[in-house]
Amino acid sequence: GKPVTIVEMLPSILYGNDSDVCRTMTELLTDRGVTIHTGAKVLEIRDGLTCVFEKEGQKLTAEGAVVILATGRKPDTAALGLEAAGVATERGFVLVDDELRTTVPHIFAIGDLTGKQQLAHVATAQGIVAAHNAAGAHRTMRYDAVPGCIYTTPEIACVGLTEEKAAAAGHPVRVGKFNVSGNGRSLAMVLGCHILAPHATEMIGEIALAIQNGLTAGAVSDTIHAHPTVSEILMEAAHDVEGLCCHKL
């Protein structure tokens, strides 16, 4: 393989995700020889191949055969004539309510240009809601149960709040954890789930379903999961919320 250097301006890679997941992925990448600089600001790209960045007051460089710039997205709505139509925007994003209506009631907007969670499956869900509402219904979008997937090796998947965000929101938080390497009744509402494991992106839908329908950790732990399957780690983690995990190493 080729040497890889990651330059990240925020305090950690995957910032905003679960802290345990961020830390573990950092360790996995480092063990594979990836050089990671966090809290670093890119200053310039010289000759298309040399990255000049600043970290802790020092100017550093990283060279490579390819430079990938991944700093987010911005809306491309300037040529759509939105202002003339009376559709309000903010920093180029189209303002919509929970029913996906713009400031012009008969005009709806979906997808990345709404400035919500910029994921393909969110746009699909928004499209369904908008279509129903355009036909006279009054459906609303929920963004608290949207799963997010990162297709690394191993995969990362998450849904709902992190432990830190749940605590900051004033929820009494209990955490259940289960190590996938050990894989071969609670009244607590499920607020979030964060997985770093093979097939994580296939498993996260179960917890999205739990959050969407207000299920408890007990509902997950009481559901018999087939063995051996990777998805049974969700049952084990739910058991661990009350310290009742049978197979935790």
Question: Predicted regions: what is each one?
Answer:
Residues 2-98, 181-182:
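A Rossmann-like FAD-binding core segment of flavoenzymes
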Residues 11, 15, 39, 45, ...:
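Flexible, acidic loop-helix segments that line cofactor/substrate-binding pockets
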Residues 19, 23, 36, 61, ...:
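Electropositive phosphate-/nucleotide-binding environments in soluble metabolic enzymes
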Residues 54, 112-119, 149-156:
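Short beta-strand and adjoining strand-loop segment in the mid-core
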Residues 135, 146, 151-249:
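Flexible, glycine-rich terminal cap/loop adjacent to redox cofactors
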